[in-house]
Amino acid sequence: MDPFSKSPDDDDLRPEAEAARRPQPQPQPREWRFAQVFGERAAGEDVQEVDIISAIEFDKSGDHLATGDRGGRVVLFERTDSRDSASRSELERQDYPIARHPEFRYKTEFQSHEPEFDYLKSLEIEEKINKIKWCQTANNALFLLSTNDKTIKYWKVQERKVKRISVMNLNTSQSSGNGTTSSSSSSSSRAILPNGGCSEKLYNFPNNDLLFPPGGCTSLRLPVVVTGQDLNLVPRCRRVYSHAHDYHINSISNNSDGETYISADDLRINLWNLEISNQSFNIVDVKPANMEDLTEVITCAEFHPTHCNTLAYSSSKGSIRLIDLRQSALCDNHAKLFEEHEAPGSRSFFTEIIASVSDIKFARDGRHILSRDYMTLKLWDINMDSGPVATFQVHEYLRPKLCDLYENDSIFDKFECCLSGDGLRVATGSYSNLFRVFGCTPGSAEATTLEASRNPMRRQVANPTRPARTLTSLTRAVRRGGENPGVDANGNSYDLSTKLLHLAWHPTENSIACAAANSLYMYYA
């Protein structure tokens, strides 16, 4: 044998190969802490229906947060803390970095949608905001899309300096002709106009009868408009995209090209250009020729985070389809189909109902898709369509109660899901204002239950010592958390009327914003 020839086993002796064989250390479970709350409800206070939050979304930088409510309003928050507030010398003296949570403050709000009535179909159109999506910023202005059941709007929010009129022909502070003294108010009164515009009245006169001084005005002066130093946030509706959906819009998603976006209803997905509001292209149509043959509907759709030609949409049958826009103008055929096959003999009346996917999210790297159905979270690898790589039980204690949940329609609740920016954890909501955080790295046993309150760990569930697994050669799926029987996962009574449907994960930090009725809670780890 040639002494200089390389043995096949030489690679096994290398340090890199040895390190690859060692089990990788698991990330430690995070300790979640309360950060902030906006709109906290007092004990016994009734919540108005229009104030209930219906959508939450961080922008890509994580410096802005938007919420929408059932009253058609959009509220914007901005980050106030400095990410790098500590100096380099201070950081060098520390043994470990101090966890700082992002702090937000109220920025502005505007009326996005108003209630409407479709006279052709005799249907009321709610003003409720279904989804909010941030668009690319430009010229220090914020851009976002908001939608209700039928209409999508494109908003621009920008700071502008307040302009005031400084020279007037009439001085309302002087005595009027009838001997009475009229007072002027320097405070401006603002009225919200349709599409979020604002009218600002700089002078409030006590009555509509302005009396000229005796002898009249000796001269007339042109009013002078002066731009002050005060800044005022002005929301403006740039585009309105309407009359493109016969059914309720359930999702919108921006494309990575920054120019287009999709909107999806129960049967169709349309492709829009942000600058063209009177034309859209139908790219997915699942409506059969005979509606009696309809077997599934579209529940959610989302663009790939980096590939502008790829998008995924989910269905009420629990499947996720990946489509490539380059294949054809109308994407009747999918590139990949992700679905979990039923175990033999496990089908029941509720099987298809609880399998319906209520939300999907792409991981930041675009490699994985997270989906939420009624009972579970599933993590899918887009390169492996044989089954999910991990399944997380959210509230398994409700499975014996499916009949009761069907009777009160709770089984049709649509919970959202989210992933951390590093892809190591996933989160979703449940009942009793609880939400769950799972570690999704292989072998992780992290399964934390938190409550949307000032004390999130009050109803903490003891984590199992090791995850319950079902390992197969085809799916390599992992099932974790929530296997304990009882009233709920911790033996506490659950409340189906308080449910945490909407939440969002900060794109770069371990921070979660979630909605409990009209309150916005924020937590960090």
UniProtKB/Swiss-Prot annotation:
Residue segments, region Disordered: 1-31, 169-191
A matching Pfam family: WD40
Domain of life of the source: Eukaryota
Comp. bias (Low complexity): 171-189
Molecular function via GO: protein phosphatase regulator activity
Keyword terms: Repeat, WD repeat
Cellular component per GO, a single term: protein phosphatase type 2A complex
InterPro entries, per database record: PP2A_PR55, PP2A_PR55_CS, WD40/YVTN_repeat-like_dom_sf, WD40_repeat_dom_sf, WD40_rpt
Renumbered ranges of WD repeats: 48-87, 124-165, 244-282, 293-333, 352-390, 495-525
Protein function: The B regulatory subunit may modulate substrate selectivity and catalytic activity, and may also direct the localization of the catalytic enzyme to a particular subcellular compartment.
Family per similarity comment: Belongs to the phosphatase 2A regulatory subunit B family.
Subunit structure comment from the entry: PP2A consists of a common heteromeric enzyme, composed of a catalytic subunit (subunits C), a constant regulatory subunit (subunit A), and a variety of regulatory subunits such as subunits B (the R2/B/PR55/B55, R3/B''/PR72/PR130/PR59 and R5/B'/B56 families).
Name of the protein described by the UniProt record: Serine/threonine protein phosphatase 2A 55 kDa regulatory subunit B beta isoform
Source species: Oryza sativa subsp. indica
